[in-house]
Amino acid sequence: MITLENLIRVGGVCHFGILTASATLPLVLDWRKSLGALPKIERQLILAWASFIVLVIIGFGTVSLVHADDLAAGSTLGRAVCGFIAFFWSFRLAWQFFVYEVRDVIEANTRWLWVGYHGLTLVFIYFAVVYAMAALR
């Protein structure tokens, strides 16, 4: 049955799926080469920021899987957590649509990269909608 709780659980699984897709990013974007040109401290900062984002996504996925019932119940804390997750992914979508310039990267690679990019966009939209529904409940 389609319930908000189950939609949140699906979101939890999708968070871990995103991490799998994100693991290919350093190879696709050839981070070794592009980051190699930066001073060491800047490379370290970028890798630290990427690590923090991974930890946040692991947290979103874990909370969504373990506490989907609490998040869907409409408590103040559950709504606040869902609101933050919805805001996070809405902000990420804004970057996807208005800031990132991916055309060259996508055209220079395979059709799978195009499919993956647009597939991730759909997942980000799913996150923004489902968690906003839970937050506004």
Language-model segments: which ranges?
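Transmembrane alpha-helical segments of integral membrane proteins
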Residues: 90-105
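Interfacial loop at the N-terminal end of multi-pass membrane proteins
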Residues: 2-8, 14, 18-56, 63-74, ...
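Individual transmembrane alpha-helices with interfacial aromatic-anchor signatures
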Residues: 48, 83-85, 110-124
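Hydrophobic cores of alpha-helical transmembrane segments in multi-pass inner/ER membrane proteins
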Residues: 56-60, 123-127
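Short alpha-helical packing/oligomerization segments
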Residues: 67-94
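Juxtamembrane boundary at the C-terminal end of a transmembrane helix
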Residues: 128-137
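A structural signal for well-ordered alpha-helices, especially hydrophobic packing surfaces
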Residues: 20, 126-129
